[in-house]
């Protein structure tokens, strides 16, 4: 590294932080710039912001650190969400295109399959749906194929309402190591589901919830046994590390925009700590 960049970087990151230095060099340094030049670029010439970064009191996300003040066409944001995947082939393919374009710009994406009709549900008058899995595989392939501006592969979060008829398939799909390999999975869990689970552990009561849903004029009915799905989820997470949990009542009712009637959180992006609205 030129001038005293190595020493300044070491002071900024802390001693014996070779991993941090390597990451800075490979991911965030632009055109062999010095550490001071990097801070100037990232702060955009703002003296107060420069001081905050230098003192490690503030830092942008990775895409801003890599792309701000450069000629790159990459995004300034790490992650986005496209919300619910539409329950029609045109909308699904358009969303898949949006995923690819987001990855190209170095962003990640989050999508929810909760509005997709389950396997066996009629399509028109002649055919039946193959359900959520084929579209998970399409999105998985796109994520694997599109590099984020040549810097890294795409990042994808796929979520599903735990009351969806295919929740069991979603929970266990990663137990096959060759299927969905390029996406994180999470279940959207509401209070009704968790209350039913709690009744089992408090009173030994097995609650059965009857679900009635309609997909483009085709009604379906089925029963959900929360404790059965809960136990399957816990076992699968123990063995495979996924799926995660998105507690929908919490993030929809406890956020800075909860009193804005026009604001509705639909799902998360791969960062998981940032919930997104469409």
Language-model segments: residues:
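Extended catalytic cores of very large enzyme megasubunits
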Residues: 1-278
């Amino acid at each position: 590294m030129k001038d005293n960049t190595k020493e300044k970087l070491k002071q900024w990151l802390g001693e014996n932080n070779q991993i941090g230095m390597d990451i800075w060099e490979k991911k965030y340094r632009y055109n062999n710039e010095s550490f001071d030049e990097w801070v100037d670029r990232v702060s955009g010439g703002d003296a107060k912001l420069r001081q905050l970064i230098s003192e490690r009191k503030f830092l942008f996300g990775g895409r801003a650190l890599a792309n701000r003040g450069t000629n790159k066409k990459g995004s300034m944001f790490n992650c986005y969400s496209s919300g619910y995947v539409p329950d029609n082939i045109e909308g699904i393919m358009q969303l898949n295109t949006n995923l690819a374009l987001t990855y190209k710009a170095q962003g990640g994406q989050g999508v929810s399959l909760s509005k997709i009709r389950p396997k066996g549900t009629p399509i028109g008058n002649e055919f039946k749906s193959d359900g959520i899995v084929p579209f998970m595989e399409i999105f998985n392939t796109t994520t694997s194929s599109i590099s984020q501006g040549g810097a890294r592969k795409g990042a994808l979060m796929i979520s599903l309402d735990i009351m969806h008829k295919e929740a069991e398939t979603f929970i266990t799909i990663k137990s096959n190591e060759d299927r969905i390999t390029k996406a994180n999975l999470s279940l959207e869990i509401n209070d009704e589901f968790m209350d039913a689970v709690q009744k089992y552990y408090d009173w030994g009561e097995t609650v059965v919830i009857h679900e009635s849903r309609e997909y483009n004029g085709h009604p379906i009915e089925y029963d959900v046994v929360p404790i059965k799905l809960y136990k399957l989820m816990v076992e699968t997470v123990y063995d495979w590390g996924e799926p995660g949990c998105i507690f929908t009542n919490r993030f929809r009712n406890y956020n800075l925009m909860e009193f804005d009637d026009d604001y509705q959180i639909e799902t998360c992006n791969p960062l998981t700590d940032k919930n997104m609205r469409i």
